Amino acid sequence: MSNNILLIDYETLGQSPDTVILSLGAIVFDMDDPPSYQEVLDQGFYETFSVDEQVKDGRVIDKSTVDWWGQQGKEAAHVLKPSDDDISYKEMIPRLKEYIGDVRGVKTFARSASFDFSITNDIVRRLGQQLPWQWWNERDTRTLIECYLELLEINKKNNFDVPDQGVEVVAHHALHDVAMDVIRIS
């Protein structure tokens, strides 16, 4: 068995490629032996980032997104509060590369590809870094889920229900969102 899937998810303060990122969740795993929800939480990559540093570096905040965050539950809003655990966004790519390991043949999925990948591309371009995965292996989680639903003739929205995971699911938490997508695609 080898790790052949990487799922990523950002939580942000906007929708543009140069938006401030609040957190990044990721999991690398073998599709033939996918992790449980709890295993994603235990083994996944999760970092929160300093907002002030990003604003000083010219990353942007969208007021409508900030307003949207204000309407989310307090579990989700935890990411808005500065924490001693916040790291520099400049450390994100090296840490993610270390977590991922060998990326040859790894398919990298995001929900949606035009959002998460554009943010990563903006960061690596600005910082003169390299993508932590092979760009030609980028995939869209929504498309995969949609095809799966159509194949099984399930008439549900793209965010279809998943069985009880035995842990509290936190919406709009990057690592929990990744865990939900692991369950959906496996």
List the model feature ranges, each with a label.
Residues 122-127, 147-151, 184:
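Active-site catalytic microenvironments for nucleophilic, acid-base chemistry
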Residues 9-11, 116, 140, 177:
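Acidic active-site catalytic centers that drive phospho-/nucleotidyl reactions
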Residues 132-154:
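Short, flexible loop segments at boundaries between secondary-structure elements
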Residues 97-100, 114-136:
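Substrate-recognition/cap helix-loop segment adjacent to the acidic, metal-dependent catalytic center
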Residues 2-6, 11-110:
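Conserved non-catalytic scaffold segment of RNase H-like nuclease domains
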Residues 61-65, 147-158:
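Short, surface-exposed amphipathic charged segments that create phosphate/polyanion-binding patches used
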Residues 107-114, 118-119, 157-186:
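Acidic, Mg2+-coordinating catalytic module of metal-dependent nucleases/exonucleases
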